[in-house]
């Protein structure tokens, strides 16, 4: 039997607005520090069919819960991401950032970026604590609605999947 551990680390998001002339109107750094760990066990099995070794979500789509998704709405670009709840007020480079490594205990945030000024506003949307953990980088936008999948792997035989809708105004 072989065990492989893969650690995915996602850092800051760099944002800028470039005018048609090529001049930079503004530049911002959104501090972010995410760490997601994937543990895979390989070996022989005496069973067949759907089981612990079979996955609905491909590991090539990893990391599932870190990273971010973005969508434009009105004069804002909205960034969705899971983060450590202690980072609720972090919007500027240089601020202390706590690592979001216990992803199942993270909060899902929407960070709005004003397209004209680059000003950042962070709002907590929900906690991932008691629900399947949000997967922001896999979100889909239809009109003003953002659909996001959540996934929980606490027990290999009792995985939970949820789909949530967020309506942008």
Which sequence ranges carry the predicted segments?
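Secretory-pathway ectodomains
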Residues: 1-169
């Amino acid at each position: 039997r072989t065990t492989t551990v893969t650690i995915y680390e996602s850092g800051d998001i760099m944002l800028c607005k470039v005018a048609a002339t090529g001049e930079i109107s503004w530049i911002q750094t959104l501090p972010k520090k995410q760490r997601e760990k994937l543990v895979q066990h390989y070996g022989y099995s005496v069973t067949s069919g759907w089981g612990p070794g079979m996955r609905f979500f491909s590991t090539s789509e990893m990391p599932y819960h870190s990273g971010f998704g973005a969508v434009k709405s009105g004069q804002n670009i909205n960034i969705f991401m899971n983060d450590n709840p202690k980072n609720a007020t972090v919007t500027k480079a240089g601020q202390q950032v706590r690592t979001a490594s216990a992803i199942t205990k993270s909060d899902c945030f929407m960070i709005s970026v004003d397209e004209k000024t680059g000003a950042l506003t962070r709002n907590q949307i929900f906690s991932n604590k008691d629900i399947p953990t949000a997967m922001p980088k896999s979100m889909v936008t239809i009109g003003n609605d953002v659909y996001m999948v959540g996934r929980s792997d606490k027990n290999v035989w009792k995985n939970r999947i949820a789909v949530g809708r967020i309506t942008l105004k």
